[in-house]
């Protein structure tokens, strides 16, 4: 099976009442092991290339590896740009054959996040790819990207309603108190 978009795989997950795992990759060996396992288990998957791998110059080589290995698979696989940092990075991923892109405008002011996401949706839809956006923040550090712990990281429902009314994305990641990384002591969550 060729690669699919998130737009194709998420309705399948909803219909079957399953979760679709997402795996961040950074080497060809890890990629091969993941793809062999999802094929063996007949488990659709999202194969994501994150910012650490991109900073190491691996965007194109990892995309080529996934495309080559996925073409003979029966199990659907999404090739996904994780936490895309700019429109230019999204375009580079689409040119490398990604079927799904995330634009992470969560650090931007709300209206700027909407504007950049609308631009990415326009470009990605023209390329036949799906789009994920992000609202809020994830506490800590993910893929060598740190988030300011002083910024509120819980998204209010009205922001989600307003964002999805303005931008038609295929998936939306929202900060709901998630925390990544290692911490000394306990993380304190409030219900505020």
PLM region spans:
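N-terminal amphipathic alpha-helix/helix-capping segment at the start of soluble metabolic enzymes
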Residues: 1-20
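N-terminal glycine-rich phosphate/pyrophosphate-binding loops that anchor nucleotide-derived ligands
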Residues: 3, 22-38, 80
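Alpha/beta enzyme core
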Residues: 9, 28-45, 64-68, 72, ...
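Catalytic beta/alpha-barrel core
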Residues: 22, 26, 78-81, 101-109
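Short glycine-enriched loops at secondary-structure junctions
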Residues: 51, 83-87
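Glycine-rich anion/phosphate-binding loops
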Residues: 84, 110-116
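Conserved small/polar residues in nucleotide/adenosyl-binding loops
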Residues: 189-192
């Amino acid at each position: 099976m060729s690669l699919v978009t998130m737009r194709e795989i998420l309705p399948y997950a909803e219909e079957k009442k399953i979760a679709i795992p997402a795996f961040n990759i950074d080497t060809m060996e890890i990629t091969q092991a993941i793809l062999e396992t999802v094929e063996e288990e007949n488990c659709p998957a999202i194969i994501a290339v994150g910012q650490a791998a991109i900073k190491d110059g691996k965007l194109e080589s990892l995309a080529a590896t996934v495309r080559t290995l996925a073409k003979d698979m029966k199990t659907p696989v999404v090739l996904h740009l994780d936490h895309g940092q700019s429109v230019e990075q999204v375009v580079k991923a689409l040119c490398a054959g990604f079927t799904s892109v995330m634009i992470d405008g969560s650090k931007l002011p709300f209206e700027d996040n909407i504007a950049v996401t609308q631009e990415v949706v326009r470009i990605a839809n023209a390329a036949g790819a799906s789009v994920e956006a992000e609202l809020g923040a994830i506490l800590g550090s993910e893929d060598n990207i740190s988030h300011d712990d002083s910024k509120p990281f819980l998204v209010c429902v009205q922001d989600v309603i307003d964002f999805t009314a303005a931008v038609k994305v295929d998936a939306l990641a929202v900060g709901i108190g998630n925390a990544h990384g290692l911490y000394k002591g306990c993380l304190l969550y409030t219900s505020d």
